[in-house]
């Protein structure tokens, strides 16, 4: 099976999203509501294109092996270094087949059954976080609830809900302060100072992930606040036009945080080859969001599992052809640019 076949199952089942056979941002451009990007809409496309600039150094002069895709992330073994990225307000942006509660249920359950985890989206309705936390608890903590940068009292209310589930980690997509459709909400999402973020993190018993880091200085601030991991992300281009692609800034962030803080990356990653590229540039794992939305709308939990399987097979193929027997063997010497 290919991603194009998975996307074909979703065509006609989604709203603003076209379920394109290649999810490169060209069809949706700046269409919001919908999966488009902010302003000109080209950040999403540049995210996708940037990974393609890195060429693979093929090396088949090695002993035969079966690639080991397992990886450790914050004390949990994952079947592959791929996680489902958080998506919110799916009914508005993708169609009425799911709402945030049922979408979170779909990806959490499917990801856990495939040996990895899903980040869950936040929402204005309390039951969004409540439902995600409840299911994560039943799945033995296999999930990462993601909270928007709301006012401090709202953030703490949501933290109280998710901490009881003992998740792998808790995340905040700090760049969501730039989402135009959140600014007019009550309460609005807003910016967080290092001091404010540190106070939030100090209230958590679980590792805390800061999502939406796009510079070395931003990464250093997240580490100073106490982050256990950062996600290099420009929110799929939905929060600020004119920013670099995530692939462009990933190496700088990796250098800035050192070895004690995990680095994840999303944005335009669409294949096992892209996963390999991200790992070679220093990422510990990757997130995909839009493709998993398409997979879920196409065939529910099975669609999500199918996409994980496709990515796993593609990554294993590239590892074999480049001489990487394990995830730890992948390094930048396996790329040319």
Regions found by a protein language model. Give the residues of each.
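Conserved active-site-proximal phosphate/metal-binding subdomains
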Residues: 1-29, 237-262, 270, 274-337
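An N-cap/entry alpha-helix motif that binds or orients negatively charged groups
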Residues: 2-79, 330
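N-terminal functional module of multi-domain proteins
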Residues: 41-129
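Structural signal for hydrophobic packing residues in well-ordered secondary-structure cores
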Residues: 51-58, 111, 163-166, 204, ...
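Flexible, glycine/proline-enriched loop segments at strand-loop-helix junctions
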Residues: 94, 119-121, 144-150, 183-188
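Short hydrophobic alpha-helical runs that function as membrane-insertion/retention elements
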Residues: 117-122, 144-146, 231-232, 286-288
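Alpha/beta enzyme core
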Residues: 109, 137-138, 150-265, 272-295
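Long, hydrophobic, well-ordered secondary-structure blocks that form the structural core
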Residues: 128-154
């Amino acid at each position: 099976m290919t991603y194009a076949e998975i996307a074909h199952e979703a065509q006609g089942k989604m709203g603003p999203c076209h379920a394109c056979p290649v999810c490169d941002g060209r069809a949706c451009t700046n269409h919001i509501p919908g999966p488009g990007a902010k302003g000109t809409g080209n950040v999403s496309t540049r995210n996708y294109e940037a990974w393609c600039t890195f060429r693979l150094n093929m090396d088949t002069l090695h002993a035969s092996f079966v690639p080991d895709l397992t990886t450790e992330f914050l004390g949990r073994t994952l079947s592959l270094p791929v996680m489902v990225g958080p998506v919110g307000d799916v009914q508005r942006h993708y169609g009425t087949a799911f709402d945030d509660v049922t979408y979170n249920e779909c990806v959490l359950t499917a990801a856990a059954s495939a040996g990895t985890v899903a980040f869950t989206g936040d929402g204005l309705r309390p039951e969004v976080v409540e439902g995600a936390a409840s299911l994560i608890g039943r799945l033995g903590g296999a999930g990462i609830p993601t909270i928007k940068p709301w006012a401090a009292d709202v953030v703490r209310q949501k933290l109280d809900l998710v901490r009881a589930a003992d998740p792998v980690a808790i995340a905040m997509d700090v760049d969501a302060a730039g989402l135009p459709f959140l600014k007019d909400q009550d309460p609005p999402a807003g910016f967080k100072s290092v001091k404010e973020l540190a106070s939030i993190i100090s209230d958590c018993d679980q590792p805390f992930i800061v999502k939406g880091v796009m510079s070395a200085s931003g990464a250093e601030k997240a580490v100073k606040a106490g982050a256990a991991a950062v996600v290099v992300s420009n929110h799929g281009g939905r929060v600020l036009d004119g920013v670099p692609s995530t692939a462009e800034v990933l190496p700088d962030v990796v250098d800035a945080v050192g070895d004690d803080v995990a680095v994840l990356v999303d944005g335009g990653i669409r294949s096992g080859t892209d996963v390999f590229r991200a790992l070679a540039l220093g990422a510990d794992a990757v997130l995909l969001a839009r493709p998993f939305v398409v997979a879920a709308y196409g065939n529910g939990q099975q669609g999500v599992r199918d996409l994980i399987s496709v990515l796993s097979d593609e990554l294993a193929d590239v590892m074999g052809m480049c001489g990487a027997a394990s995830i730890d063997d992948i390094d930048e010497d396996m790329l040319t640019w």
